[in-house]
């Protein structure tokens, strides 16, 4: 992939500095690049560095707007600490011919390492033996398809039915972005055009709970549809499977999960059912343990998939995923938490805090106006997150009763730590 050493990023830094507000933090990036453009923007950067104006670039949470006028969706980036945890949430426009059918998808990073990945593109850039170094056919049959991303696929078809012209007409709508508090940062957006008749509303929050070792990510995908559909909700994790709290069967031989729209490239390695209303799936990646805790229904199917089917030239990575399949469903909520915890040392060969701190995750309220999710830890302490689903202002007051208890707040959401 690209880095800030590429010529295009040298151009971007110099132009942004010269024509922007001359942010001195950009100068530190230019110093690392050790290269400037031979024009007035590059000269301005060089003079700024010469005069000692450079400052360290601070990576902070930011909402980047898409489109010529900044009104075609965007990308929300939530960060905790010094890149301790970084969430990249996409609610942008199609992205011209490079665009993927990946509305409301996201990637998650831990100190720069991928935790939940976006596959990216199917191309070995400038490696002649691989399709001349150009885009491979799998870029269209896999990488662009919705099922290749951490987002919702309906009825095994991609967003906009995989049609570029249709996708180019629409973009997702930001509900709100709030990174004003370090311990609770939230981004929320809606998509109403990817599947006609279906509304997807995804809210992602980066939260630091006092009883937990690390910050965690709360993911609420609210789906509204008058029709009965099959929903597939994958998590493309990076690492080695450690544990899960459900039983599954592995087939004697691997067969593709489907025939088209990317499904033809996925092998089904395991299939099971939830053993409880809270399903957990853990893995180890880059020396850190991660647990996905998700609220499941008894009828859900839990799938373990592996990329690589219908790939005789080995153009695709053999990446794995955990997938929730929910059939014959209209309105529903997928509520999940991704929790980093503990570590494993290959030097001492010791593991620490390898178990999740979460005992239960539950959708305790859901209607058109509000969705509430509770997180209960193993000590019985309960945290509560309530989302106002309708577009509202920071000043709007809300009142809701859940289980006989009343909650009042102002703004887009309510959150209370245990």
Which stretches of residues belong to each language-model region?
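Ser/Thr/Asn(+Pro)-rich, low-complexity disordered segments
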Residues: 1-5, 16, 67-70, 100-116, ...
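Catalytic and substrate-binding regions of extracellular carbohydrate-active enzymes
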Residues: 17-18, 24-254, 330-332, 336, ...
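Non-catalytic terminal regions with compositionally biased, polar/charged low complexity
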Residues: 31-33, 39, 326-332, 338-418
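Active-site-adjacent bridging/hinge elements
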Residues: 82-87, 197, 303-316
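Short, hydrophobic/proline-enriched secondary-structure or compact coil segments at domain edges
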Residues: 190, 277, 281, 369-377
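Short, hydrophobic/aromatic-enriched beta-strand segments in well-ordered soluble domains
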Residues: 235, 288-309, 332-343
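Polysaccharide-binding surfaces and accessory modules of carbohydrate-active proteins
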Residues: 236-297
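A surface-exposed beta-strand-loop module
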Residues: 313-332
């Amino acid at each position: 992939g690209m880095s800030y050493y590429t010529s295009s990023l040298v151009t971007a830094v110099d132009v942004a500095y010269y024509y922007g507000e001359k942010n001195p933090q950009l100068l530190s990036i230019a110093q690392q690049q050790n290269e400037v453009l031979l024009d007035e923007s590059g000269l301005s950067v060089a003079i700024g560095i010469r005069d000692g104006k450079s400052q360290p670039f601070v990576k902070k949470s930011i909402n980047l707007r898409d489109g010529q006028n900044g009104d075609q969706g965007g990308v929300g980036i939530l960060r905790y600490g010094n890149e301790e945890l970084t969430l990249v949430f996409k609610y942008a426009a199609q992205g011209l011919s490079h665009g993927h059918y990946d509305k409301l998808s996201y990637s998650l990073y831990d100190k720069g390492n991928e935790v939940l990945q976006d596959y990216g593109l199917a191309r070995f850039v400038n490696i002649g033996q691989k399709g001349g170094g150009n885009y491979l056919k799998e870029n269209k049959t896999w990488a662009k398809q919705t099922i290749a991303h951490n987002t919702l696929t309906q009825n095994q078809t991609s967003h906009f039915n995989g049609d570029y012209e249709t996708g180019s007409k629409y973009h997702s709508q930001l509900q709100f972005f709030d990174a004003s508090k370090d311990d609770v940062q939230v981004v929320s957006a809606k998509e109403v055009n990817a599947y006609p008749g279906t509304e997807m509303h995804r809210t992602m929050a980066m939260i630091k709970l006092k009883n937990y070792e690390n910050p965690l990510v709360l993911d609420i995908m609210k789906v509204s549809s008058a029709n009965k559909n099959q929903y597939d909700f994958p998590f493309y994790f990076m690492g080695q499977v450690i544990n899960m709290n459900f039983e599954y069967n592995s087939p004697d031989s691997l067969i593709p999960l489907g025939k088209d729209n990317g499904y033809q490239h996925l092998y089904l390695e395991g299939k099971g059912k939830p053993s409880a209303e809270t399903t957990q799936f853990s893995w180890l990646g880059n020396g850190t343990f991660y647990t996905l805790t998700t609220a499941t229904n008894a009828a859900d199917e839990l799938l373990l998939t592996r990329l690589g089917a219908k790939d005789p030239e080995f153009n695709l990575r053999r990446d794995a995923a955990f997938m929730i399949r929910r059939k014959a469903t209209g309105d529903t909520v997928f509520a999940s938490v991704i929790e980093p915890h503990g570590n494993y040392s290959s030097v001492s060969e010791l593991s620490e805090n390898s178990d999740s701190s979460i005992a239960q995750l539950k959708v305790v309220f859901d209607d058109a106006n509000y969705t509430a999710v509770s997180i209960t830890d193993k000590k019985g302490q309960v945290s509560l997150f309530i989302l106002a689903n309708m577009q509202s202002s920071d000043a709007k007051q809300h009142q809701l009763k859940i289980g006989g208890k009343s909650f009042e707040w102002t703004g887009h959401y309510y959150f209370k730590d245990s």
